[in-house]
Amino acid sequence: MKADAKQITHLLKPLRLLLLGAPGSGKGTQTSRLLKQIPQLSSISSGDILRQEIKSESTLGREATTYIAQGKLLPDDLITRLITFRLSALGWLKPSAMWLLDGFPRTTAQASALDELLKQHDASLNLVVELDVPESTILERIENRYVHVPSGRVYNLQYNPPKVPGLDDITGEPLTKRLDDTAEVFKKRLEEYKKTNEPLKDYYKKSGIFGTVSGETSDIIFRNY
């Protein structure tokens, strides 16, 4: 079944979707579209969770800041503990739960840990989609990206500018650039991503649930749903 602007009100089985893509590939935008198309779907973003931890200056947040400022991916153990705890707290481990994961897992070790956790609850991932976007496009997006930190709303000065320059459309509060939204840091992040993404893609291809779509389209194919 092909997702379009209409809502998908019925699926043959609970959808547990992993959205893959390099930093800046548009995973947040795709997530927003999917949540509108599938009302019963919920989402969790590792990036949003981390930013919340950093803002609260928790122990985990301070530890994560060190890695992010250097353009490095977080260690498997650190991010895995955070995400699996949140999945459990939200009650999303039961077989009937429907959700979308953005930004996790990023390594085969994280993927294996997630599979094992879901297996313990008689559940599993059943669709993995990668957003394919040229690196030049990503870097251009990042240079023009601003965010409203409290809500997570993202703006781009070229194709999604705020109504009032520098201010959030809803609250009127100031927009900021993320700590890692610089070309220098992002190039490092893209290299780190490439190193871990190929093994991760191979991991999910073996399970038969992997697919790729252009990150510049809104089309995601839902097979057998």
Curated annotation (Swiss-Prot):
Record carries keyword Kinase: yes
Keyword Magnesium: no
CDD domains referenced in this protein's UniProt entry, alphabetically: ADK
Subcellular location: Mitochondrion matrix
Residues the entry annotates as binding GTP: G24, S25, G26, K27, G28, T29, R145, V154, Y155, S218
Upregulation: Expression level is low on glucose or other fermentable carbon sources. Induced about 3-fold on glycerol, and significantly induced by ethanol.
EC class (word): transferase
Gene Ontology CC terms, in alphabetical order: cytoplasm; mitochondrial inner membrane; mitochondrial matrix; mitochondrion
Alphabetized UniProt keyword annotations: GTP-binding, Kinase, Mitochondrion, Nucleotide-binding, Transferase
Region feature (NMP): 45-74
Comment on activity versus temperature: Optimum temperature is 30 degrees Celsius. Active at 30 degrees Celsius, and rapidly inactivated with an increase of 5 degrees Celsius.
Described function: Involved in maintaining the homeostasis of cellular nucleotides by catalyzing the interconversion of nucleoside phosphates. Has GTP:AMP phosphotransferase and ITP:AMP phosphotransferase activities. Does not accept ATP as phosphate donor.
Subunit structure: Monomer.
Record remark: domains: Consists of three domains, a large central CORE domain and two small peripheral domains, NMPbind and LID, which undergo movements during catalysis. The LID domain closes over the site of phosphoryl transfer upon GTP binding. Assembling and dissambling the active center during each catalytic cycle provides an effective means to prevent GTP hydrolysis.
Any further remark recorded for this protein: Present with 704 molecules/cell in log phase SD medium.
UniProt-recorded name of the protein: GTP:AMP phosphotransferase, mitochondrial
Protein species of origin: Saccharomyces cerevisiae (strain ATCC 204508 / S288c)
